[in-house]
Amino acid sequence: MSCFSQVLNPITGENSWQEREDDYDYHQEVANAGFGDMLHDWERNQKYFAALRKTIAEMRTAGKEVHVLDIGTGTGILSMMALEAGADSVTACEAFLPMANCAEKILAANGAADKVRLIRKRSTDIQIGEDMPRKANLLVAELLDTELIGEGAIGIYNHAHDELLTEDALCIPARARCYAQVAQSPLAAQWNSLKSLANLDGEPLLQPPAQLKGCKGEAGLHDVQLSQLPSHTFRPLTDPVEIFQFDFQRKKQREKKRDQLLKVQSNQPGSAELVFYWWDIQLDDGGEILLSCAPYWAHPEIHELSGKKGKDLPLPNVVPWRDHWMQAIYYIPKPLQLLEAGKSFHLSCHHDEYSLWFDAREEAPAKSVSRHTCTCDLHMTYSRSRIGQMNQSTRNKRYLRYLEENIEAEKSKVLVLGNGCLLGLASSALGATSVQLHEPHRFSRRLLESIVQHNQLKNVEFVDKVEEVEDSQLAGLTHVFAEPYFLNAILPWDNFYFGTLLAKIKDKLPEDVKISPCSARIYALPVEFLDLHKIRAPVVSCEGFDLRLFDEMVERSAEQAVTLVEAQPLWEYPCRALSEPQEILNVDFNKFSEEHHLKGTIDLKHPGTCNGVALWVDWQLINDSSPRSIVSTGPSEAVTPGEFVKWDMFVRQGVHFPQKTNQTISSLAWSTDFKPLLGQLSFTFGQKKP
């Protein structure tokens, strides 16, 4: 059966009714759960299997029976490993029913249906005697995330030891260690705080108010593939230090909240702005089988791994790739200036049941440092990438060049469309007679109002809807300006909402009004990802176990719930270009309502496996041939077939993953259909063999 659901269309800005199957939410959860990513993590799989073999063999040698509990079994892969390693009994629990049903079929397909007791419950709901005949003496689980404890591992382990495990139970993993490294990074700092906006001569146009400068920001992690952060963009100020240990095996309760004050020493002068964070796990009791999530420069096996990898693979990519356990950046509330190498300071580390936070101070704090939150609206309103985008110098200069060349003091009247458009506010500082900002979002508007007040801008008016602008005001406009950026946008072309807003008032604007951007172009680039394609690639088998039933389940769900193009920050996921970029859509905002139906072929110029197509938008600020009139959301440097692509680090690009990625092709057929009045933009891509 099917039902109708209200869905916001980002291009039209309106809710529309879409017919969807009753189980659409289930399919969406299955398709986006990330199980496949974990199953492609060869190091995780091999080391879990090795730890099970080693631990079960040692328990056997000690004369013990082995009764295994697998919490959050997923596909059942760890349960099957435990059986293969010689466990006497295995109980697996999985609360996500679609996954539990799939696990049941996978266990049967691998001959383990009658050997694994599958419980469709959370582990915290399991009762001994009712669900399990006895307590387990070996727990195997994967309950961790990038932050280690963000999925509730502390509470789950505490409950398991209290209710489900014997006094002498062992755990895989046995323990975890968390690490921090204090660093300075002008680039990463742009993701956290708002800088002054200056004109092309470097003179300030807009200054952030005191409430922004004094805000401590959000304590939450910024999860990134830290190995992909260019080495020239940061300076480690300390060596990595161990900050917390979590003993998953001990019977005593794991504390839900701890504070750790470490006296550390700088290895060079700089500003202690942020903390790089990662963890490792010792999978066996003896600590011999180690899995590290460290970035490449701190990875304990970097020399061994770099010797095994091909010479054409960049050093940051020799460490095992995974997207479910990344690294994180935590921003220090008030950066600490370290004036010399060898300077001692205090790193304050804290965790509660689900999260961590940090501070750095010259003197030891007198009491525990509370978890900080945003008090300025910036961090609670915008994503990290958007905050960075607002600070992005090269991008801002192109917009400011247009504004400085076109805004006439005491003559220009400007309408700004978008959310949080500081560049639009800059037109007021440049002398525009009036500036009207379309800003319907409550917190974004409050932030901009504070900037207007602090910079004493007298000619700025906010409007909730473009329809509220009086006809006489529209008729007197000299400029309509946008970046464009809208809070509801996920994919780059979702910001075509600018065209929708413009179309509502176009007939009331003077003929000579200047509209910027005047047009937008979408480009497509066939690429070969090193790893990102694995999040959608079939698993087939894992450590000798047949997982094709899992692939079929995910494929069915993906067909119903996954868009053909998804948003990804491609700077974190290296890929080689297989051709030059090709334009697949050009939208003229003066004729936005026109439909487009296009198709073509991209010839591949470099041999490789096309396992992805990257897509992005170039905004044309003014209709001329200067490259400085283009603001791109795609590559930050010219693309060369066969070379790695360098991507804009402050926006997400679109990615299409072909269904078949294991064959060499000579060209890629594409088609684009754009119906702006309906807000429908779709792409198709078809591979052509040589």
From Swiss-Prot:
Keywords: Methyltransferase, Repeat, S-adenosyl-L-methionine, Transferase. Residues 14-357, 366-690 form the SAM-dependent MTase PRMT-type domain. Transmembrane segments: none annotated. It is an enzyme of class 2 (transferase). Gene3D superfamilies: Hnrnp arginine n-methyltransferase1 (2.70.160.11), Vaccinia Virus protein VP39 (3.40.50.150). GO terms for molecular function: histone methyltransferase activity; protein-arginine omega-N symmetric methyltransferase activity. It comes from the Eukaryota. Disulfide bonds: none annotated. One of its GO terms (biological process) is peptidyl-arginine methylation. InterPro entries: Arg_MeTrfase (IPR025799), MeTrfase_PRMT7 (IPR014644), PRMT_dom (IPR055135), SAM-dependent_MTases_sf (IPR029063). Its EC number is 2.1.1.-. Pfam families: PrmA, PRMT_C. Essential arginine methyltransferase that can both catalyze the formation of omega-N monomethylarginine (MMA) and symmetrical dimethylarginine (sDMA). Specifically mediates the symmetrical dimethylation of arginine residues in the small nuclear ribonucleoproteins SmD1 and SmD3. Belongs to the class I-like SAM-binding methyltransferase superfamily. Protein arginine N-methyltransferase family. PRMT7 subfamily. This is Protein arginine N-methyltransferase 7. It comes from Drosophila ananassae. The lineage of its organism: Eukaryota, Metazoa, Ecdysozoa, Arthropoda, Hexapoda.
